[in-house]
Amino acid sequence: METTELIEIIGRDKDSKHQFKANVTNETSLAQEMVAFSNSGGGAIFIGVSNDGTFAGLTREDMGRLNQLVSNAASQQVRPPINPQTENIATPDGLVIRIVVPTGVSKPYMDKNGVIWVKSAGDKRKATSREEIQRLYQSAGLIHGDEIPVPGLNIADLDIDYFKVFFERNFSESLDDQDLPLPVLLGNMNLMENGIFNVSGALLFARNPSLRLPVFITKAIAFPGKEIHETDYVDSQDITGKIADVFQKSIGFVLGNIRHIQGDQGVNAPGEPEIPKIALEELIANALIHRDYFVSAPVRILLFSDRVEIISPGHLPNDLTIENIKMGNSNIRNPILASYATKILPYRGIGSGIIRALKEYPDIDFVDDHDGNRFIVTVWRKVPHV
């Protein structure tokens, strides 16, 4: 790293990717910082930079001691051990050591006392909530939010008529001809365990999944202007039901609250929506299928006079970036739900949804909000000609 680049980073102050320390003598404290970065997407620790942005003036002797301290902290104080990279940077006011901590592949990482640390903006904190710890296991592929049991939803909650149609259409067999009891059959389909629906099974086939999963719904609101208003809205709906119903109702809500344009059609034609339906289908399907089901929050669809926002709980998983998804890369967060969604929704499961949405309607922005733990899609509406 060049000194000019280091100065630019220092000028931006610490954040969730950069930490500054004048000097370090405590292995335990350094290990906690490493754990937090390993659990939170990686980052860099700069030793030799004071809180006010000035250089602390480290010497060659300091470099030897600090490199040994980094090695000891990473191998003996972090569980499982990690392998950070170090770089010594020369400045006119002394040396700086940069410690690069990659995002971990064996989350959750802990300190030697079993404490899980994560980054929170420019600081670190202990991860204590069950949901947060579950998300760390999820990011390592050890558990998935869609396979968690839903106590209180059992075989009596199955929408049997809907399931029969699905089963016969996709397996070319009559459900009535199956020798297995329904709980066993649903268990074999990874939708139920010990007679209890998991999240996937409930969202796909329960009559009223929101009975036990009240936050896994879609909240849709249309506002009259460009900002959220506390009391004034044009339309508002809490959309509940099976995921297929939520999908269709969500599409209907957006289409019912945006303009329809005549274009080249005759005067009696219904007009085409200003945002193509195909683009909306891809974006809303992605929101429902790929949201983080360890986050107790609904999908939100917010309509404004100039845009439509689709906000999904959970930022992009692991190392996935906005640039990646625009190129068709994917990381399936909810594999059971995604496998059945290909049979129920206009969803292919091959990472092409964002590409198709952009092809149909390029005026779409994406924000991967790690601090807010959400993914925001903004579809800009066409300005009407006056």
Q: What are the functions of these language-model segments?
A:
Residues 1-45, 49-98, 104-107, 274:
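Polybasic/polar functional segments that serve as interface/processing modules
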Residues 356-360:
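A short beta-strand->alpha-helix segment at the C-terminal rim
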Residues 120-284, 288-295, 303-305, 317-331, ...:
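Active-site helix-to-loop segments that bind/position phosphate- or nucleotide-bearing substrates
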Residues 49, 90-92, 213, 303, ...:
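Generic beta-strand structural signal
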Residues 308-344, 383-386:
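Glycine-rich/acidic phosphate-handling loop/turn and adjacent ATP-lid/helix
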